């Protein structure tokens, strides 16, 4: 086995790809490998809080990553600096992942126990993908086969794939379910050729009931692996076995992917997942806090949700970073503390250019007004007042002229825009509820 420091550095590089940036920066980056004795890898964490968190949240992922790198089933122990001198004491290590047992052809325990349909937060950006995944889980190979889910990093594709696997196994314990990444498929295929075990490899993946394969875009350019996966796909599909595939883009946009594979990916259902809206981001944070037994003020939830809008991993990682920071400096969690905790991971980006459309959408989200109603002739208070707020913000946050603003609101006269701006400006001086609503809208627009 390679030098222990080199091994751990290699593991950290892989772990950095698998967790959010905040999680990596907070929990993993500062760890070091202490020693390796009798198949037990001892990792040094910076403090007790980090050690306990790593043990409860990352030991399984670390075991899996090390197994992928070395092929060895290593147990994991976490220590803190002052306990290094005592590392020879026979303390019970974290048990290696049972999925690493070579006798288990079907690594069902590779499924993350936290990734179920019950823990998935449904929002406008993932509702259809969730419904399709549930339909596939309830009736494998009868609903959509294959199911192709695509979207950006950390949006929930892997969560849905694991949820499908859990559901199938729960309702049919004898089902053969395999989850793996396309990278692992490629590595195992290459190893099978090198070791003259191609038949074993094919039997392993062509005799399953459900194949869940993640990040299929990494097959691009790998001609031999694509050839092998093509035949694996055909074998499973012909036997009415379910195939679920994920990617960061739709099949037609994956470069150097063979047309015959592309067409097969399009046989079933293709569904996408988009970044969560503010409401969904807050719901995700609340669910994460509840799952971890954390009491987080609403103002902190809103702050984090406004600052982190890229993906769910970053969002949850930011929440945990805030909690860790609060614990380490022994201060209560509030918005100011959250800002301090996240200052290093929230990039100082250029000021966002806000359009009138952005404003209409944000105001519409807060006041439950359809976009078309901003341009309509409706004068009911439920529409007219939000329209005036949107006009006010368009005047405040964009460089658009009065006539241009009026045009974007159904061709209204510039005097209407002036009146709306004056009215809302006056109300904001005394109306605390309106102040909060406008603040919420501004948060969405950041």
UniProtKB/Swiss-Prot annotation:
Gene3D superfamilies: 1.10.1750.10, 1.10.8.60, 3.30.300.180, P-loop containing nucleotide triphosphate hydrolases. ATP binds at residues 154, 156-158. Residues 81-109 are annotated as: Domain II. GO terms for biological process: DNA replication; DNA replication initiation; regulation of DNA replication. Residues 110-326 are annotated as: Domain III, AAA+ region. GO terms for cellular component: cytoplasm; plasma membrane. Keywords: ATP-binding, Cytoplasm, DNA replication, DNA-binding, Lipid-binding, Nucleotide-binding. It comes from the Bacteria. Residues 327-446 are annotated as: Domain IV, binds dsDNA. Residues 1-81 are annotated as: Domain I, interacts with DnaA modulators. It is found in: Cytoplasm. SUPFAM superfamilies: P-loop containing nucleoside triphosphate hydrolases, TrpR-like. GO terms for molecular function: ATP binding; ATP hydrolysis activity; DNA replication origin binding; lipid binding. CDD domains: AAA, Bac_DnaA_C. Oligomerizes as a right-handed, spiral filament on DNA at oriC. NCBIfam families: DnaA, PRK14086.1. Belongs to the DnaA family. Domain I is involved in oligomerization and binding regulators, domain II is flexibile and of varying length in different bacteria, domain III forms the AAA+ region, while domain IV binds dsDNA. Plays an essential role in the initiation and regulation of chromosomal replication. ATP-DnaA binds to the origin of replication (oriC) to initiate formation of the DNA replication initiation complex once per cell cycle. Binds the DnaA box (a 9 base pair repeat at the origin) and separates the double-stranded (ds)DNA. Forms a right-handed helical filament on oriC DNA; dsDNA binds to the exterior of the filament while single-stranded (ss)DNA is stabiized in the filament's interior. This is Chromosomal replication initiator protein DnaA. The gene is dnaA.
